[in-house]
UniProtKB/Swiss-Prot annotation:
The keyword Plastid applies. The gene is rpl33. It comes from Oenothera argillicola (Appalachian evening primrose). It is found in: Plastid, Chloroplast. SUPFAM superfamilies: Zn-binding ribosomal proteins (SSF57829). This is Large ribosomal subunit protein bL33c. The lineage of its organism: Eukaryota, Viridiplantae, Streptophyta, Embryophyta, Tracheophyta.
Amino acid sequence: MARGKDARVTVILECTNCVRGGVTKESTGISRYITEKNRHNTPGQLELKKFCPYCYKQTIHGEIKK
């Protein structure tokens, strides 16, 4: 049987460039990705470089609260 909390949790990554710039008529939304992280290996907030279809380039996507 498993003991304690699960180490792996689901997190949502959101484009930091879209959030800072605000949603305008040019960008129709904010890019979000769903992924998993291991709490023991990465206790802090996760930041990954992913492609944003609204910015048309690779930007930093940061973890957000659910």
